[in-house]
């Protein structure tokens, strides 16, 4: 009986004066959003630091990450979320914002083969013309459910490095993937 009375009193309080509950929920949502923004900024900073190390380590001209997302009309799209480049390379990040994945053959190739090392024109002639890279090393980024969420790539304007450290690249990719999934 006491429980019923408490429920009735609590219900009346909510019915006649719900604003404290709404205010509390709003504050909770705002705090949660702030924490997510801080975590995202920290993760992005760590990813940029890793990419800077990898750009030097693999002697690339550009290193980048394209992240997949749903576009305006619910088409599968991608955006170049991260791009670092050396002094002789021009940025291309803004050419790859909200583009439809079907415009290029590279995403489909990676969906089937998971990675690519070689001449860019062999896998995607359109990309080789539009961003001046002759060679690329790239790998599909997958989440923990094995769903494709993006592409990690290193671009070379003239030639691939003489010594490719494929085992290092695989280990570095795993480290980067963990950060992307934070």
Annotated model-derived regions:
Residues 43-49, 132:
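Short linear interaction motifs
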Residues 113-134:
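Signal-transducing coupling segments at domain and membrane junctions
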Residues 50-62, 67-70, 177-180:
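Short regulatory alpha-helical segment in sensory/regulatory domains of signaling proteins that mediates
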Residues 134-143:
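A short, aliphatic-rich beta-strand micro-motif
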Residues 66-97:
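GAF sensory/regulatory domain recognition
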Residues 1-42:
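Membrane-aqueous junction of the first/signal-anchor transmembrane helix
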């Amino acid at each position: 009986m006491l429980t019923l009375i408490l429920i009735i009193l609590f219900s009346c309080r909510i019915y006649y004066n719900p604003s404290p509950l709404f205010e509390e929920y709003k504050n909770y949502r705002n705090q949660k959003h702030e924490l997510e923004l801080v975590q995202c900024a920290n993760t992005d900073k760590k990813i940029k630091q890793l990419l800077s190390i990898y750009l030097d380590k693999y002697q690339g001209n550009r290193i980048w990450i394209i992240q997949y997302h749903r576009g305006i009309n619910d088409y599968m799209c991608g955006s170049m979320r991260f791009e670092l480049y050396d002094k002789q390379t021009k940025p291309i990040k803004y050419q790859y914002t909200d583009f439809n994945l079907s415009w290029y053959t590279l995403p489909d190739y990676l969906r089937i083969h998971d990675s690519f090392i070689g001449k860019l024109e062999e896998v995607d002639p359109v990309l080789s013309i539009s961003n001046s890279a002759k060679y690329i090393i790239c790998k599909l980024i997958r989440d923990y459910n094995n769903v494709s969420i993006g592409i990690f790539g290193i671009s070379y304007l003239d030639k691939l490095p003489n010594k490719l450290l494929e085992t290092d690249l695989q280990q570095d990719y795993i480290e980067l993937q963990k950060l992307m999934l934070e």
